[in-house]
Amino acid sequence: MNDQTRQRLLNLEALVEAGFAPYPYRFPKTHSAEAILKAKRGAPPESEWPEEEVAVAGRLVALRRMGKVTFAHLLDETGRIQLYFQRDLTPKYELLKKLDVGDILGVRGHPFTTKTGEVTVKVLDWTPLVKSLHPLPDKWHGLRDKEVRYRQRYLDLIVNPEVREVFRRRSEIVRYIRRFFEAKGFLEVETPILQPTTGGAEARPFKTYHNALDHEFYLRISLELYLKRLLVGGYEKVFEIGRNFRNEGIDHNHNPEFTMLEAYWAYADYQDMAGLVEELLSGLVLHLFGSHEVPYQGRVLNFKPPFRRISFVEALKEKAGLPFDPLDLERLRLWADAHHPELSQVPNYKLLDKLFGIYVEPELQDPTFVFDFPLAISPLAKRHREKPGLVERWDLYAGGMELAPCYSELNDPLDQRERFLEQARRRKEGDEEAPEPDEDFLLALEYGMPPAAGLGLGIDRLAMLLTDQPSLRDVLLFPLLKPKKEAVEEGV
């Protein structure tokens, strides 16, 4: 225990001896800081409203004792407001010296404005609610060490108001998306997180074991296959906002635990879904920013519809300078071996995706639909109705990263079985990301799934883009981190 913690415990003891409950059960707040400031902002200096009693509570983030008067700043969820304590008005005034910055305090009083016009609460009664046993980070330098910010997000939220705003904005984004799909007649559903097989994407899963069922299960890597079962069951428009888990690497736009929206629309195709997504995102941006322009990492992205549309194959051929059709995987392998030896261990069918990420993806800053992907990298999409070797799939990019894939969904059970068997063959050859065939899903398809469009929208990446953050960790309240190796200090 350090000296500061020891002193704070002594201060707590003194408050208890004076008759205060150490950790009371409740405090009847009547106002937020924001509500008081909004009601009185702009009032002339030295105005006072003694008949308007307010009760506010929050954390002390500044404390300035000046003999017969004490000023403090109290922070609640909505912002901070100044408090004014006066010896001849405030009960137990001398005990204020037992308060520390970081304590949680409840006060009652009435609002007034100071000589400089600052809206302030004149405190007529006060109650310590929680004694903080540790000082807050330095007020001038705040909390800037990213590792500490991620591990102790609670401190980050206390001292960095802009961080609180990021997560409010994230919640607003999710709320808008949910209401949009509900207004379009989509039904929100929940599907299993624990699944007996993996499917819906190619990724390494997390495994777990269910003792009562004596069976190995996986944390889902995708929402897709269970939502498609609902189309078989008769629902025509469904969506889910939920967590997926992939046992893979971590970087600025990948996290093993992430949030996706998936939506499935029966009797529609990928062109229909493109129009819906344009409407969703352009409307969301207009709602948040008042225009279609989004500031992101030194650029301004324009979300005014219609979004740009390009071809996967043509864009890759042009940007990489390929003198042949990229769908010729044997020639593509020879070319990649000569120009990108670091990709020598990448299977041929994944080369297309890897090279697209190198040559095309970084240039896709304004929202862009990339249409018509190769069949080899799209095992769940319907074959293109006009272009052999391609599927009806688009991916939406913005800010140089993928935000959302969409398919005209494959609903031919025989074709789907063949593609699953190809994935199984690759799995036997050592591809750990290739899933095993999901026989129950194939059975569902054999009963008949209507033609449909399917969308997957990455909520974390979208939040990252619309809050101008450089990393997914900045839009995840508690991102996954390597456990600290240091021994846990003995608690107080």
Curated annotation (Swiss-Prot):
Gene Ontology biological process terms, A to Z: lysyl-tRNA aminoacylation
- Designated name of the protein: Lysine--tRNA ligase
| Primary residence | cytoplasm
Q: What is its EC number?
A: 6.1.1.6
Q: Where does Mg(2+) 2 bind?
A: E402
Write out the entry's keywords from A to Z: Aminoacyl-tRNA synthetase, ATP-binding, Cytoplasm, Ligase, Magnesium, Metal-binding, Nucleotide-binding, Protein biosynthesis
- Note whether rRNA processing occurs among the keywords: no
Question: What Pfam families does the record tag this protein with?
Answer: tRNA-synt_2, tRNA_anti-codon
Q: Per the UniProt entry, what species is this protein from, by scientific name?
A: Thermus thermophilus
Domain of life (superkingdom): Bacteria
Q: Which GO terms describe its molecular function?
A: ATP binding; lysine-tRNA ligase activity; magnesium ion binding; tRNA binding
The record's cofactor note says: Binds 3 Mg(2+) ions per subunit.
Q: Where is the protein localized?
A: Cytoplasm
Family of the protein in this entry: Belongs to the class-II aminoacyl-tRNA synthetase family.
State whether keyword ATP-binding applies.
yes
UniProt subunit comment: Homodimer.
